[in-house]
């Protein structure tokens, strides 16, 4: 090789290069892509690349009857589909002036907290896998499957229950279901110390997660962070308590918080929420047998139901953060507009991009899993 073709000593080769995560990658949650520019193993630039799961949910809802969308909305967030059903139903009930029976409200709360338990177990498993702790992942999936068994008994569906409808729920609680749910809660509570020893207090995990993906409370509020990710910065805000819906104002529960604002704090908040969801479910199990009455209010023929003209903005607390629906009716048998304000829209795009800056390449996966984002919710 000629000497003039050699690179000058004053211009050493650059260590900067670009790397694509996903859309199929073990460190990515779901079909999602993340593009980073690196200097060695340090992230200089980060850009979320969504769209791999785009199915146009919001537009599809405009062409379907009000009742038909109940089968569509759970698919917006597969790990935690129940809040999607409930929030959409609450919006229709507000526009249509429907009064949901008391028993149906308690059943909805029961289903919401069961879904929260299942979603958090799923999140723990995914995060544990990014740090090589596959036993925690297997435990989380196995224990989540027991909750799905109860969903199947209650609703007929393990993942997509399609159980909540405008005006109430499809059917009542099966005989003996509350006893079986109570036994499951006893089992799950007995498992929490095992999860603590294996994962949450494991020094390998603690050292890997502490200080990773940290944000302050001011940053979290500026970036639109909600749910466990916001509470991990020390702000005690939860829609269930601060803007109560259904019967949450009749329940006794605490709002867990942490002050670290990092991946470890976010996981510890979700760990504490498991115990609070179990606490709520036990109150429902105790109260529900004494609450009699119908499980749904009368509505017109759902296949020819012209919901009165109006609009509604409703919100609930999902396992991933504040979920809201803005629904507009022009008096027809289909929605004029449905807008979903999902927490993952913020967490998986702008928050993830900002927290990745300056991080090491090996920590990108656990930053994403600690935010517990849901890609289909981004691509709605």
At which residue positions do the language-model features occur?
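Active-site bordering "gate/hinge" segments
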Residues: 1-380
């Amino acid at each position: 090789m000629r000497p003039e073709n050699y690179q000058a000593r004053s211009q050493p080769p650059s260590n900067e290069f670009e790397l694509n995560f996903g859309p199929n990658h073990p460190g990515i949650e779901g079909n999602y892509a993340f593009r980073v520019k690196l200097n060695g193993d340090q992230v200089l630039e980060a850009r979320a690349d969504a769209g791999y799961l785009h199915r146009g949910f919001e537009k599809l809802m405009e062409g379907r009857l009000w009742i038909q969308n109940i089968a569509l909305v759970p698919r917006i967030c597969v790990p935690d589909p129940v809040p999607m059903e409930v929030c959409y139903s609450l919006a229709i009930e507000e526009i249509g002036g429907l009064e949901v029976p008391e028993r149906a409200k308690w059943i909805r709360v029961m289903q919401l907290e069961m879904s929260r338990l299942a979603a958090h177990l799923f999140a723990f498993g995914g995060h544990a896998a990014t740090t090589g702790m596959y036993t925690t992942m297997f435990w989380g999936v196995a224990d989540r499957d027991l909750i799905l068994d109860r969903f199947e008994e209650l609703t007929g569906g393990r993942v997509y229950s399609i159980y909540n409808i405008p005006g109430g729920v499809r059917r009542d609680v099966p005989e003996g279901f509350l006893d079986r749910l109570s036994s499951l809660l006893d089992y799950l509570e007995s498992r929490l110390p095992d999860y603590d020893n294996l994962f949450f207090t494991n020094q390998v995990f603690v050292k890997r997660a502490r200080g990773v993906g940290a944000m302050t409370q001011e940053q979290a509020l500026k970036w639109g962070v909600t749910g466990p990710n916001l509470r991990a910065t020390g702000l005690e805000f939860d829609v269930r308590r601060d803007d109560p819906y259904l019967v949450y104002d009749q329940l006794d529960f605490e709002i867990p918080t942490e002050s670290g604002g990092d991946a470890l704090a976010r996981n510890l908040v979700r760990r504490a929420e498991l115990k609070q969801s179990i606490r709520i479910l036990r109150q429902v199990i105790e109260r529900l047998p004494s609450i009699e009455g119908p499980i749904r209010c009368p509505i017109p023929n759902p296949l020819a139901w012209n919901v009165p003209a109006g609009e509604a903005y409703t919100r609930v607390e999902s396992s991933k953060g504040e979920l809201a629906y803005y629904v507009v009716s022009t008096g027809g048998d289909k929605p004029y507009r449905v807008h979903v304000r999902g927490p993952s829209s913020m967490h998986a795009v702008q928050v993830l991009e900002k927290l990745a800056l300056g991080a090491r390449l090996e920590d990108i996966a656990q930053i994403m899993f600690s935010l517990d984002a849901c890609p289909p919710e981004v691509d709605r």
